[in-house]
């Protein structure tokens, strides 16, 4: 396949005697932890997080808020059950646990966080406190 991309493994052919140095002990590019990308944007009303989680059901994803204003998004992609007669030619889809944590700013309304999942995209909305403009009162100057 001319459009396929195989990542070169510089350690593949080295006869390491210490298993701690083997290539399999290094983090893999396709691990779920690495591939869980999350966007964070701030609108005038809220902080909005979007995560692409293809193939996951909402029951497989956890959204949690910790006391110190930390938003945690975690879950697990399960490995496909393997039949002994199956021969795999390529495994590119990631599996395993993932977790991402974000410290929210002071203006986050921690008690009003909402999460929704649609078509494999998780959206977490954290409303912001309204910035109160100082009330200015004119004082009349007497003579």
Swiss-Prot record:
Induction: By stress. One of its GO terms (cellular component) is cytoplasm. Its main location: cytoplasm. InterPro entries: A-crystallin/Hsp20_dom (IPR002068), HSP20-like_chaperone (IPR008978), Small_HSP (IPR031107). It is found in: Cytoplasm. Residues 29-143 form the sHSP domain. Keywords: Cytoplasm, Stress response. PROSITE patterns: SHSP. Forms oligomeric structures. Belongs to the small heat shock protein (HSP20) family. This is 18.1 kDa class I heat shock protein. It comes from Medicago sativa. The lineage of its organism: Eukaryota, Viridiplantae, Streptophyta, Embryophyta, Tracheophyta. The gene is HSP18.1.
């Amino acid at each position: 396949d001319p459009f396929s991309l195989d990542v070169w493994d510089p350690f593949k052919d080295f006869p390491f005697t210490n298993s701690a140095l083997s290539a399999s002990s290094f983090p893999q590019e396709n691990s779920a932890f690495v591939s869980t990308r999350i966007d964070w944007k701030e609108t005038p009303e809220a902080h909005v997080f979007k995560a692409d989680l293809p193939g996951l059901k909402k029951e497989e994803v956890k959204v949690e808020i910790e006391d110190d204003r930390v938003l945690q998004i975690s879950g697990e992609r399960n490995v496909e059950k393997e039949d002994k007669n199956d021969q795999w030619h390529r495994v590119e889809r990631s599996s395993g646990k993932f977790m991402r944590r974000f410290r929210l700013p002071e203006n986050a309304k921690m008690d009003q966080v909402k999460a929704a999942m649609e078509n494999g995209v998780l959206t977490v909305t954290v409303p912001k406190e309204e910035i109160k403009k100082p009330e200015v009162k004119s004082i009349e100057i007497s003579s």
